[in-house]
Design a protein with these regions (language model features):
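Often metal-dependent polyanion-binding catalytic scaffolds in large enzymes
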Residues: 1-19, 23-166, 391, 403
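Structured core elements
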Residues: 6, 16, 226-228, 255-257, ...
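Generic, well-ordered alpha-helical scaffold segments in large soluble proteins
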Residues: 25, 29, 44, 48, ...
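Flexible, glycine/charged-enriched surface loops at secondary-structure junctions
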Residues: 36-42, 56, 72-80, 187-192, ...
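Conserved, charged catalytic cores of large soluble enzymes
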Residues: 96-158, 164-186, 261, 270-284, ...
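Long, structured ligand/cofactor-binding scaffold of large enzymes
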Residues: 143, 149-286, 290
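Conserved small/polar residues in nucleotide/adenosyl-binding loops
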Residues: 419-426
Length: 431
């Protein structure tokens, strides 16, 4: 190894490469680990050094060299690589390995517009100093390499264009706790902050990505998911699409209750036109979901819900699978098929399920969620009404199709729209 190589430091100055310094960092990172070879990591990384290399690139090269050695026979390389990555992240965030005081860090980040100023409005300097005593930065060293990469990619506050990192893991955890308990009584809230911090930083509980990445920022993302109720009018459908884009950009996962949309061929404006059905509007929602990312953290994601008795259900159940063509598939959302006790009962008795367009059966969709007895009364009434468009399908065939698609895609969910379902009311042993 040529010890006359020049390296470019983070401040732009240059100096000769210091191999002893690299060795000391590796020695520190390997402490207490089993079956790891520092010299092996050094050999793999040294051959990639060149004159003028940045110190940050040296660090990333060493991290990759350690990560490449992870194997079933030598799993501790994952912790060696993780510790090196933590060291690198802290240097990027703070310019040094030791994190600053929590209060000083929060003040700086609020001034930069990276943290929500409510943190300084809700808590005093003394409270931040007390929170600082709760923090155990050594917990960073328990991460595996995969966990550190997840942390860096999804959760740490950062500039996703330039790659600048602004915090380390323990500040993330303590500030999420501070945000979540800020409205608790002053005399007890720090106890909750400490207990929550200890639980989340030792992996006893996990948090949704939107909260982990956004709750302490000006976005103030306290909810991980948003349910949007879509009506049957164009105004409501377009408002739903607009809300999807807005909430996806705010890091929220999306639930779309789209069961009110009328079926293909239904009359519009008294027969002036006929309806194009659900699928074009589902595609519209899918485009909205994928139009922007969840605050740069990950792509937008949505689950769309509709009732099992919808007239188009047989076409909707297959939207996720890999058969068919783009025109009759909407593959980039997940789906929830809403069922209730009556659907189960028809299955167990070997009877038919009758499919309707929600626009043709007034009150049925509302009763489906609000009053099961009223739903059953209306459902049987509409089944007998020959003036209403309908289709009868064997319950076992419909349930079989649903379960086949659920098994093949893994992304069809089955919420039961009956909160008082009891085991003795439906013989579930026959399911």
């Amino acid at each position: 190894m040529n010890q006359n190589l020049l390296v470019t430091k983070r401040d732009g100055s240059t100096e000769r490469i210091n191999l002893d310094k690299i060795h000391r960092v590796l020695d520190w990172a390997a402490e207490g680990l089993h079956n790891v070879s520092i010299s092996q990591v050094e050999l793999r990384s040294h051959i990639q050094f060149y004159d003028g290399i940045k110190t940050s690139d040296i660090h990333e090269t060493i991290i990759k060299a350690a990560a490449d050695l992870i194997s079933r026979d030598a799993p501790d390389y994952q912790y060696l690589a993780a510790r090196l990555a933590i060291f690198h992240l802290r240097k990027k965030a703070y310019g040094q390995f030791e994190p600053p005081a929590l209060y000083d860090h929060v003040v700086k980040m609020v001034e930069m517009g990276k943290y929500d100023n409510h943190l300084l409005e809700d808590y005093t300097e003394e409270e931040f100093k007390q929170m600082d005593t709760f923090i155990d930065h050594d917990r960073d060293m328990t991460f595996s390499y995969a966990a550190v990469k997840q942390l860096e990619g999804k959760y740490l506050v950062q500039n996703r264009v330039t790659g600048e990192i602004y915090e380390s893991a323990q500040f993330l955890y303590i500030l999420v706790a501070a945000c979540l308990f800020s409205n608790y009584p002053r005399e007890t809230r720090l106890q909750y902050v400490k207990r929550f911090y200890d639980a989340v930083s030792t992996f006893k509980i996990s948090l949704p990505t939107p909260i982990m990445s956004g709750v302490r920022t000006p976005t103030r993302q306290f909810s991980s998911c948003v349910l949007i109720e879509c009506g049957d009018s164009l105004d409501s459908i377009n408002a739903t699409s607009s809300a999807i884009v807005k909430y996806v950009s705010q890091r929220a996962g999306i639930g779309i209750n789209a069961g009110r949309i009328r079926a293909l061929g239904s009359p519009i404006r008294g027969g002036e036109a006929f309806h194009t059905g659900c699928i074009p509007f589902y595609k519209h929602f899918q485009t909205a979901v994928k139009s922007c990312s969840q605050g740069g953290v990950r792509g937008g994601a949505a689950t769309l819900f509709y009732p099992m008795w919808h007239l188009e259900v047989e076409s909707l159940l297959v939207l996720k699978n890999n058969r068919g063509v783009e025109g009759n598939r909407v593959r980039h959302m997940d789906y929830g098929v809403q069922i209730n006790k009556l659907m189960y009962t028809r299955l167990l008795k070997g009877e038919d399920i009758t499919l309707f367009s929600p626009s043709d059966v007034p009150g049925l969709y509302d009763a489906f969620f609000a009053d099961q007895e009223e739903f059953e009364r209306l459902y049987t009434k509409y089944e007998k009404d020959d003036s209403i468009r309908k289709q009868r399908v064997k319950a076992v065939e419909l349930f079989s199709l649903m379960m086949q698609e659920r098994a093949s895609t893994g992304r069809i969910y089955i919420p039961v729209s009956y909160t008082h379902l009891r085991a003795h009311e439906t013989d579930q042993s026959r399911m």
